[in-house]
Regions:
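A beta-strand edge to alpha-helix "cap/lid" segment located at domain peripheries
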Residues: 2-3, 55-142
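A solvent-exposed, acidic/Ser-Thr-rich amphipathic alpha-helical stretch
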Residues: 5, 24-27, 31-75
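Short, low-complexity N-terminal intrinsically disordered segments enriched in polar/charged residues
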Residues: 1-28, 133-142
Length: 142
């Protein structure tokens, strides 16, 4: 199996862990000194902290969808485009599009992952003319 295919399989494994709420190898997937940056500011250092976050978050929410749209590979990096939807224990629903920028080490472990989010509820503020009309609702956190 080629390197790109192996990386894609590992990304699918990571997304499946969240969908199934089951750790099937976080400490093997991420390096001991991995850095994981969420799109809304939290940053985790080390595979142990990433596992702690995964275990704790899974008690507060359920990911309903994390669909992969496409991958881009260059050298030791992969970018994956995805669509995400989760429901928190309090009933709050979050749904957005995103990208993950991933760097791999020589052993095909993730050593860096940074997420970028984009509100899926987009609009054109200039649809009615040259003066922008913005929505009254609060935008998502990213």
């Amino acid at each position: 199996m080629g390197t790109e295919r192996q990386r894609e399989n590992k990304i699918r494994q990571w997304f499946s862990m969240w969908l199934d709420k089951q750790d099937t190898g976080i400490e093997e997937l991420f390096t001991p000194d991995a850095v994981y940056i969420e799109s809304w500011e939290p940053e985790y250092h080390g595979n142990g902290k990433i596992k702690l976050w995964f275990d704790e978050w899974s008690t507060r929410g359920t990911i309903e969808r994390w669909d992969i749209r496409q991958y881009f590979h260059k050298g030791d990096q992969t970018v994956v485009e995805w669509a995400f939807r989760c429901v928190m224990a309090d009933g709050t629903v979050q749904s957005f599009d995103g990208l993950s920028l991933i760097r791999w080490n020589e052993a095909s472990q993730i050593c860096f992952l940074q997420e970028f989010g984009c509100n899926e509820n987009r609009y054109d503020p200039y649809a009615q003319g040259n003066t922008p009309v913005f929505r009254e609702e609060q935008a998502l956190w990213f």
